Amino acid sequence: PQFVFSLFSVFGWCCMRLLHGHRNWGKLLGLVVGAVAFFCFIYGFTEGFPKMQVKRITIYVPNLPKSFEGYRIVQFSDIHLGSYYGWRGHLPQRDIDSINAEKPDLICFTGDLQNVTPDELPEYQALLSSLKARDGVMSVLGNHDYTYYMDVDDEQEIAALEKRMQDFQRSCGWRLLMNEHVAVHRGADSIYVAGTENYDKPKRTNVRKALYGIRPGSFVLMLQHIPKQWRETWPSIINKEKDEDGDVIGPDRKDSLVVAPQLTLSGHTHAGQVSVLGLRPSMFTPYDYGLFEEEGCQLYTTSGLGGTVPIRIGATAEIVVITLKRK
């Protein structure tokens, strides 16, 4: 608010000098706008951040096996457990209860469990272990789940900290996908769930490795933390050695073709955390929020549940209930 007031005050002074006026109306305008900004931020911290919605979408895909008609997936993302201190401490319990109440076939977590360090996690082990779905919980790592935001240079310490995060997720009964895939079966039918490591800072992703060995014609659900990586999975790009930006996709077998995922789930952007009249900080980020489709592939980017800075205005936190239907 003080910055807003100062900005308008300087603007008003310039106008006063140019127009030879006697009153700096910028100060009054700055006072009003600054007061509005102050109350908006108070609202975002106290009322906006705790809000959570259950969003339901139906996604139609052409090659879904009959046994998976109506298959229900709950996606949650970016919970940032280090932000739930003090009066916010009850929110993770509410979120997990909401997920379990949906009785999904599969739960998918698309990254950023911690803010900075795995020290934030142990008190939530019992809670996260209570997530229940017929086919379990599958997860990928987000950029905050590595050591990029820690002041650590020793390679052994970095490896140990990252292993703690990975071991924690596995200790909760989650299936952590690190450039790999698993099959989910219903009788003779099956679908595949693949997941990649982080796309940037640090860059550990290998899309082709995650998909290698999946039968052609199979339905594939891909979990990727950062939505802009979705482009690497398009049919026109996925079997090239480099993507459209010239970055190496990372084929392990150059003589093998891999299947393009029909559906990708991502997070990372938090939908900007602040959205006013459709304007949000993340709007210039590719695929920052919502459902997208290109080349027969679909992406859903969720607004997530938390954030390193606990504030939300008009970008409500969410869990997403996805029902798969045959096209």
Model regions and ranges:
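Non-catalytic terminal accessory segments
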Residues: 1-50
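Soluble catalytic domains of enzymes that build or remodel membrane lipids, polysaccharides, and related
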Residues: 66-327
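Hydrophobic alpha-helical transmembrane segments in integral membrane proteins
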Residues: 31, 37-65, 83-90
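Generic structural motif
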Residues: 10, 17, 62-64, 327
